Amino acid sequence: MSLGRLLRRASSKASDLLTLTPGGSGSGSPSVLDGEIIYSKNNVCVHPPEGLQGLGEHHPGYLCLYMEKDEMLGATLILAWVPNSRIQRQDEEALRYITPESSPVRKAPRPRGRRTRSSGASHQPSPTELRPTLTPKDEDILVVAQSVPDRMLASPAPEDEEKLAQGLGVDGAQPASQPACSPSGILSTVSPQDVTEEGREPRPEAGEEDGSLELSAEGVSRDSSFDSDSDTFSSPFCLSPISAALAESRGSVFLESDSSPPSSSDAGLRFPDSNGLLQTPRWDEPQRVCALEQICGVFRVDLGHMRSLRLFFSDEACTSGQLVVASRESQYKVFHFHHGGLDKLSDVFQQWKYCTEMQLKDQQVAPDKTCMQFSIRRPKLPSSETHPEESMYKRLGVSAWLNHLNELGQVEEEYKLRKAIFFGGIDVSIRGEVWPFLLRYYSHESTSEEREALRLQKRKEYSEIQQKRLSMTPEEHRAFWRNVQFTVDKDVVRTDRNNQFFRGEDNPNVESMRRILLNYAVYNPAVGYSQGMSDLVAPILAEVLDESDTFWCFVGLMQNTIFVSSPRDEDMEKQLLYLRELLRLTHVRFYQHLVSLGEDGLQMLFCHRWLLLCFKREFPEAEALRIWEACWAHYQTDYFHLFICVAIVAIYGDDVIEQQLATDQMLLHFGNLAMHMNGELVLRKARSLLYQFRLLPRIPCSLHDLCKLCGSGMWDSGSMPAVECTGHHPGSESCPYGGTVEMPSPKSLREGKKGPKTPQDGFGFRR
């Protein structure tokens, strides 16, 4: 069969699968029964917040989607997730969430007793059992139902038995409260009555069929089986291992009522808000365990009544990533697909979205009664949107770093070094040695001996600053405690606590960070301390590993880098002015949406945290530090962090435009993206934006200083594009940058009557 026919057939099957009128349309075509599982995947992780990660970062579980009747929509999708730990101990209250009451598996007749093996006779497989078996793999499993009369035994292949058991968290020796594997490899439940007096569970004999799962097979053509390479469906026409266990488990007792409220984990996990990360209280051990059981416990929601579903792919193959489910009360649940399967889930959601839209048109159901938003983000950029030198530089390693040092220890070819760091970053093993150069604590012309002498001198100065702080008068100390120390003491104990370097009670590294921040407030009282500075100091201390050196690196960061946490309003306003102009130049549609929102939209509240905390809370630490290094390299601009902001908007801001989000919704949209954006993708896009900006033959005078301070590098002169005046210079008759105002032609004047001239008319920018 050709690939086109295969995909069309797969699409047809998906339409049958997701028909919003369970029970069929009477045309004889196959349909999905109420409660039918249509997607399942094991080892889908839930990650607890920082305060609970000491009890384990990864909490894998079993996730499935199944159909359920809905009075308003006809049918809806139910998402259920059960932690592997509860499956392992056969927690029936938890298992009922992934095999609902209406499921045909639940309604299937169960054997009342064990079938004893005939003495001296071994079980011989019947011709029916010799048919090709369907293997539930540890990869993603999509279950497609068919109405068929024949019976067929479905079991894993022998080589997959151990893999299946491990994927479900089943050990070789099973205690009585855990599931066991039958010879066919299907998980089965052992009731307390089946346990022997010695406390050991009896192993099923070869002739026992108690742990087997029977599926109907008649009418299923060979063409209905989709290859895993089709990127559409995998493992069709089979029930999941958990459903198999529940189908034949005679010891299981299910509650017949399905009206219990959703798991308390709905309210247990909130996404980071616009002002900071989730502020997790400090629990004692019993409270931590209880909170963990709530957050990482059974989770079940009706996807048809959620606010949004978002899929974030994190790998180039677009199989792994995160699923973020948001309720209408703006509560979030994040599921991590570390081992693939997210692409298949995306196929299911897209088909469901299409069917739902068709159903809404037919029944005229209000859109606000269903899932309002659905989006997919894939980490790919077209080749036309990448810097031409993107793949030419590798990460700066030890050997490459040593090649830049001469015999005296001086850094040679500084421009090439900064360019290499801009494109490739720095290896973790040498960050502590290279960062002081980027932060201008060390001069590139300094020798090794001069740097050692500088360290001794700066250590003495640091000691004097600390002594000045400790020798304050009582009145000075009270004022200092009220204005600085109180906030510092509150912040340092919750900064980067998931980092091993700062983890644990009475950690001396936390005290070092505290002293650095307090001493900096004494060293620079005009700046003092503002919330967020601890987020900047912590990574530097963890890499430099010396309190005095870290202090002076932080001083260099605050003095010589625009990419800092600044408490002054005028600095933030300057950053926002540049960012608005960049968006006007590079992303016209988004800028026009901001203008349509008025002054609130142009304030761009969604990006304030990006600028104040240097993206520390928007990306995982490894990616955030890569962004820091690219900004510290000062390659071709001192404002590369603004290009990072534009890149985020360009990649993740389409939903804002398409859905015409208001200011508060836009703030929520970008806040929800925290820790789910692809840092490498954003970096590549930002480098491309900078490259295209440098190619512009003319720029608005409002962006004249964007690339002025970084120097010309190896060239005799810097970039000198023509400057076009924007005309916004109150109190000045002429443009201070020598910009010229282009006189419009009569033709453009006639066109101007039809509407205002957009930035896109004045500046050509290759997207």
Swiss-Prot record:
Protein origin, superkingdom: Eukaryota
Stated role: May act as a GTPase-activating protein for Rab family protein(s).
Biased composition (Polar residues): 175-194
Ranges of biased composition (kind: Basic residues): 107-117
Stretches for region Disordered: 93-138, 169-228, 729-767
Entry protein name: TBC1 domain family member 16
GO cellular component, one term: cytosol
GO molecular function, one term: GTPase activator activity
InterPro entries membership: Rab-GAP-TBC_dom, Rab-GAP_TBC_sf
Transmembrane regions: none
Classification via Gene3D superfamilies: 2.30.29.230, putative rabgap domain of human tbc1 domain family member 14 like domains, Ypt/Rab-GAP domain of gyp1p, domain 3
Example GO biological process: regulation of receptor recycling
